[in-house]
Design a protein with these regions (language model features):
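Beta/alpha (TIM)-barrel catalytic core signal, keyed to glycine-rich beta->alpha loops juxtaposed to Asp/Glu
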Residues: 129-223
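Active-site mouth loops of central-metabolism enzymes
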Residues: 22-42, 92-104, 137-145, 173
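Active-site beta-loop-alpha junctions enriched in small/polar residues
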Residues: 21-23, 62-64, 91-95, 126-129, ...
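N-terminal binding-site loop/beta-alpha segment at the start of enzyme catalytic domains
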Residues: 1-86, 154
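Generic structural signal for well-ordered alpha-helices
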Residues: 1-3, 48, 71, 75, ...
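Structural motif corresponding to the early beta-alpha repeats
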Residues: 81-102, 127-130
Length: 223
């Protein structure tokens, strides 16, 4: 396995990560498409064991993956191994306006820790900035999800206490939001430890926009 060193933390992260969005079920299809069948936990355990045995140590999940069950399945599988042997990436996926209030977003983060069976997250992302919701444009939605409720500042506090080791964001949508967050980083308003973008042979649109001082993670690398 090839690894990259996170310059901020010294983490030795596998070049290939394990996305936990399409976990197998006990029926046909994955838990992303099939909401009726439960996740096949034994199969997930075996997949995680195989990945770790072959050098993969970065596992990416979210509260909304697999009909809301990905984090729990991920936590069950990973907790069977030493905590120091893997890195967990999850997200604040507060897409629904019901999750925008501060207490609801905080509760989402706390549930993530519980499901993942850990007291800290290695990599926490603001999930999919740049999109609109509930008739709001991208800026209004971003403000509702992270700024008006003070949740971004709260996440910074969690990082300062060690409950989040790296704070970043994933991006899809309005590039002006992407540029704004990079500007905040340059101005010292908020420090981003990493960003995650869609990057592959077809999608190179945002590669040059990345700040060279911020570690980059790519999703959808095979398309």
């Amino acid at each position: 396995m090839t690894y990259r060193i996170n310059p901020n933390t010294g983490d030795k992260v596998s070049l290939l990560g394990f996305g936990m969005m399409r976990l197998p079920t006990t029926a046909t299809g994955t838990a992303r498409e099939n909401s009726d069948a439960p996740i096949d936990q034994q199969a997930v355990n075996e997949m995680v064991d195989y990945a770790l045995a072959h050098g993969v140590n970065y596992f990416d999940t979210s509260p909304v993956y697999c009909q809301g069950h990905s984090e729990e399945a991920t936590g069950i599988a990973l907790s069977r191994h030493p905590r120091s042997s893997y890195f967990i990436a999850t997200k604040l996926s507060n897409f629904s306006d019901a999750a925008w209030p501060r207490k609801e977003s905080q509760a989402m983060f706390e549930r993530s820790l519980n499901y993942l069976r850990t007291d800290y997250v290695d990599y926490l992302l603001l999930h999919s900035i740049g999109g609109g919701a509930r008739g709001k444009d991208a800026f209004e939605t971003f403000n509702a999800r992270y700024m008006d409720n003070g949740i971004l500042d709260w996440l910074v506090e969690q990082k300062n206490t060690g409950r989040i080791r790296n704070l970043g964001f994933s991006y899809h949508g309005d590039v002006r939001i992407f540029d704004l967050l990079l500007k905040w980083h340059d101005e010292g308003k908020y420090h981003w430890d990493f960003v995650q973008i869609q990057l592959n042979y077809l999608d190179w649109h945002y590669a040059k926009r990345n700040n060279p001082g911020i570690p980059r993670f790519a999703n959808s690398s095979y398309r």
